[in-house]
From Swiss-Prot:
Compartments reported by the entry: Cytoplasm
Involved pathway(s): Cofactor biosynthesis; (R)-pantothenate biosynthesis; (R)-pantothenate from (R)-pantoate and beta-alanine: step 1/1
Known catalytic reactions: (R)-pantoate + beta-alanine + ATP = (R)-pantothenate + AMP + diphosphate + H(+)
Other information: The reaction proceeds by a bi uni uni bi ping pong mechanism.
Primary gene name: panC
Subunit structure: Homodimer.
Organism this protein belongs to: Bacillus cereus (strain ATCC 14579 / DSM 31 / CCUG 7414 / JCM 2152 / NBRC 15305 / NCIMB 9373 / NCTC 2599 / NRRL B-3711)
Binding site for (R)-pantoate: Q61, Q153
Designated name of the protein: Pantothenate synthetase
Catalytic residues (positions): H37 (proton donor)
Domain of life: Bacteria
């Protein structure tokens, strides 16, 4: 595995790889890699000749009161995970390398961002889209891999890639969970022992809602209220949202049918966790 720290070197490498006809699987991350990231890397390894991993904590996608400085970082650990999962090139640029001068252009996302996390984090998805535009131009991937834990992000990226005719295939990968059901996340390290137990109820609430839908409930308000009530009863966390939308358009539905997403965000003392399920309802 080779570690690359400059845009120029990474572009030269990927340009030569694509010229030689090799497919490139790209996994963009903010580091502090866990089994969810490893799953993305293994999927990329299976489907491509070359695997490129980027580790970059992107300041553009953090708001003024968010956890940019607290976001966990451990490049030695990330290097080990990368090596264990078949990464060929680890792209690890500094903020100064990615944004060497005042940014004159950003990508504004006008759909799919006014709900769920986008509603709580104005400017977040503009930051995501901007850094991905740069990373796609730098790594020139054949395929790019994203976890469905950030399902809104996946929907935004798919739209952005289509709108700008970017020649990359977006590959969504199912949420990776701990054995007890908690969605793996770099932010889980902020949970206290009691909160770690309570956090299990996020996924349980989604499973209960799914069972209710499968039993025939089609009223979205009944489903979302069920989730909110369950979480408020079983945890000390604060429900940021528990919402149901069509997916990937993220538009309101009057009836639970077609492909939908049921998504939740819950604030504990030191961390905000998200989770979701997507399903197709006939």
């Amino acid at each position: 595995m080779k570690i690359v720290t400059t845009v120029q070197d990474m572009q030269q490498i990927t340009s030569e790889l694509r010229a030689s006809g090799k497919s490139i699987g790209f996994v963009p991350t903010m580091g502090y890699l866990h089994e969810g990231h490893a799953t993305l890397l293994r999927k990329a390894r299976e489907e491509n000749k070359i695997v490129v991993l980027s580790v970059f904590v992107n300041p553009l996608q953090f708001g003024p009161n968010e956890d940019l400085d607290r976001y966990p970082r451990d490049i030695d650990r990330d290097e080990n995970v990368a090596k264990e999962n078949g990464v060929d090139y680890l792209f690890y640029p500094s903020v100064e390398e990615m944004y060497p001068a005042e940014q004159t252009t950003t990508v504004e996302v006008v759909k799919r961002t006014d709900v769920l996390c986008g509603q709580q984090r104005p400017g977040h998805f503009a930051g995501v889209a901007t850094v991905l535009m740069k990373l796609f131009n730098i790594t020139v991937p054949t395929r790019a891999y994203f976890g469905m834990k950030d399902a809104q992000q996946v929907a935004v990226i798919e739209g952005f890639v289509t709108d700008f005719n970017i020649p990359v295939t977006i590959v969504p990968v199912d949420i990776v969970r701990e054995e007890d059901g908690l969605a793996k996340s770099s932010r889980n390290v902020y949970l206290s022992q009691d909160e770690r137990e309570e956090a299990l109820h996020l996924y349980r609430s989604l499973c209960i809602a799914k069972e209710r839908i499968e039993a025939g409930e089609r009223n979205p308000e009944i489903i979302t209220n069920l989730v909110k009530d369950y979480i408020e009863t079983h945890t000390k966390g604060t429900v940021d949202y528990a919402d149901l939308y069509a997916y990937p358009s993220l538009t309101m539905v009057e009836k639970v049918e077609g492909r939908i997403i049921l998504a939740i965000a819950v604030k504990f003392e030191n961390v905000r966790l998200i989770d979701n399920i997507t399903l197709t309802v006939k």
